[in-house]
Swiss-Prot record:
InterPro entries: DNA_bind_arc, PDCD5-like, PDCD5-like_sf
GO molecular function, one term: DNA binding
Region spans: Disordered: 1-33
Lineage: Archaea, Methanobacteriati, Methanobacteriota, Methanomada group, Methanococci
Protein name per the record: DNA-binding protein MmarC6_0793
Length: 118
């Protein structure tokens, strides 16, 4: 398990705990928001190191259109960079190819309906 997965799991656990407590503890909510902001800042710092300027702007546009897909791409980029499997900085052309592969891996299977007439 890599550090990003551990942080993500810990963040989810804290969010679940905060939901259980509800709005009763504003200090815990503030602390959780602060930790989430730190996590986002750290993620953006890593992405700035990994991606070229063009690739970052492409990722920002994707984030506006498909936030969940962009989040998934960010996590995969960070994991690949930590494993040393990415050229740094990542060019826009390489990033486009990587996006195509990620999209192909995650696209839903096409369902076909066949109508047989008698």
């Amino acid at each position: 398990m890599n550090p990003e997965e551990i942080r993500q799991r810990r963040l989810q656990e804290m969010q679940a705990k905060a939901q259980e407590q509800g709005a009763q503890d504003p200090e815990a909510q503030r602390q959780m928001q602060e930790q989430q902001m730190q996590y986002e800042m750290q993620k953006q710092k890593i992405l700035r190191q990994i991606l070229s300027e063009e690739a970052r702007s492409r990722l920002a546009r994707i984030k506006l259109a498909k936030p969940q897909f962009a989040e998934q791409v960010e996590m995969q980029l960070i994991q690949l960079a930590q494993a040393g499997k990415l050229p740094i900085p990542l060019t826009d052309e390489y990033f486009k190819g990587l996006l195509d592969r990620i999209y192909e891996m995650n696209k839903p299977a096409k369902k076909e309906i066949t109508i047989m007439r008698r």
